[in-house]
Amino acid sequence: MQLLDTLEQGLKEIDARGLRRRRRTVDSPCSAHMTVDGRNMIGFASNDYLGLAAHPLLVAAITEGARRYGAGSGGSHLLGGHSRAHAQLEDDLAEFAGGFVDNPRALYFSTGYMANLATLTALAGRGTTLFSDSLNHASLIDGARLSRADIQIYPHADAEALGAMLEASDAAVKLIVSDTVFSMDGDIAPLARLLELAEHHGAWLVVDDAHGFGVLGPQGRGAVAEAALRSPHLIVVGTLGKAAGVSGAFVVAHETVIEWLVQRARPYIFTTASVPSAAHAVSASLRIIGGDEGEHRRAHLRSLIALTRDMLKSTPWLPVDSHTAVQPLIIGSNEATLDVAASLDRANLWVPAIRPPTVPEGTSRLRISLSAAHSHNDLEQLEHALMKTAEARA
């Protein structure tokens, strides 16, 4: 019983600090308007940035994929589970997101977490130094730790500090690792400067474009395309359960890098391949993202971002200067943040409260996630509820 006692005490401590996380049950497709725990709500919690998760064409595509390929893959990618749908999607992703390198190739993963672990553990090891942004996603942090490489943390988005670290390093292999869009602040890494430093110091740049792919850049090709980067020393990870509206993730790089991952990336090799129907649906999603409808959705999303930025400035709390679909509003303490989120919840608005350890102590916040499925009226309701909450707390 000793372990249970330890766990129960740990949970009590989590509760005492206002850090208990609770799941909510969604009874409807992911969209701006959802049924959550039996209640009709406007959701500002998902990463469905283009509003594609319930798109009829994607629902039809995943249904068609299930009919064609069945319910499951039946094995790992190297042992019978690599379907035509997976192969086609990798070709589509290489063409869509691989414009930054000659001879691009893509590798499809079940999750973004797996893709980051696979990339860092396969490419880095003893004798490698990883230079990691202090606000990188947990999957990049864990991948770096598991790689057994030396890890140097540079201050968030501080290219000058990173340059000094690179200058002082005598590592045989150097990898700079960064999110493109940071998931809790919504800001964008100085990608052009990071690549400049990488090439000057003989390093590689690995970026996680989870929150940029589909939203940023020409035709939604991502943050790397928006920054017009091009280099054989660049590796891009992206996710397919956010703007793409389905599930999974990918790595795009020079074909030699991808072949190395196929041969050496344990999170890729030793797991069952994702369901082929999901891959089939993602290929359909890429056609929407890169077409006229995708551009219309991105334009609408940009208008929502501008409105939200203006609206948050009128609150008594601290908005983060974000030009992306992630719009944080820093409240401060855990208790106050939970109280504000609960007030919005009573107004049938689902806005998650983000607390440590996800964000630093004293910066607990509401994370307002915008989607092209939202309307201007949805934002007006959010603004009204925020103002009413602020008045009640004054």
From Swiss-Prot:
Its EC number is 2.3.1.47. GO terms for molecular function: 8-amino-7-oxononanoate synthase activity; pyridoxal phosphate binding. Gene3D superfamilies: Aspartate Aminotransferase, domain 1, Type I PLP-dependent aspartate aminotransferase-like (Major domain). The keyword Manganese does not apply. Coiled coil: none annotated. It holds the Pfam family Aminotran_1_2. The keyword Transferase applies. It comes from the Bacteria. Its cofactor is pyridoxal 5'-phosphate. It catalyses: 6-carboxyhexanoyl-[ACP] + L-alanine + H(+) = (8S)-8-amino-7-oxononanoate + holo-[ACP] + CO2. Transmembrane segments: none annotated. Keywords: Biotin biosynthesis, Pyridoxal phosphate, Transferase. The modification N6-(pyridoxal phosphate)lysine is found at residue 242. InterPro entries: Aminotransferase_I/II_large, AON_synthase_class-II, AONS_Archaea/Proteobacteria, AONS_Proteobacteria, PyrdxlP-dep_Trfase, PyrdxlP-dep_Trfase_major, PyrdxlP-dep_Trfase_small. Disulfide bonds: none annotated. Substrate binds at residues 21, 137, 358. Pyridoxal 5'-phosphate binds at residues 112-113, 183, 211, 239. GO terms for biological process: biotin biosynthetic process. PANTHER family: 8-AMINO-7-OXONONANOATE SYNTHASE (PTHR13693:SF100), CLASS II AMINOTRANSFERASE/8-AMINO-7-OXONONANOATE SYNTHASE (PTHR13693). Catalyzes the decarboxylative condensation of pimeloyl-[acyl-carrier protein] and L-alanine to produce 8-amino-7-oxononanoate (AON), [acyl-carrier protein], and carbon dioxide. Homodimer. Belongs to the class-II pyridoxal-phosphate-dependent aminotransferase family. BioF subfamily. This is 8-amino-7-oxononanoate synthase. It comes from Paraburkholderia phymatum (strain DSM 17167 / CIP 108236 / LMG 21445 / STM815) (Burkholderia phymatum). The gene is bioF.
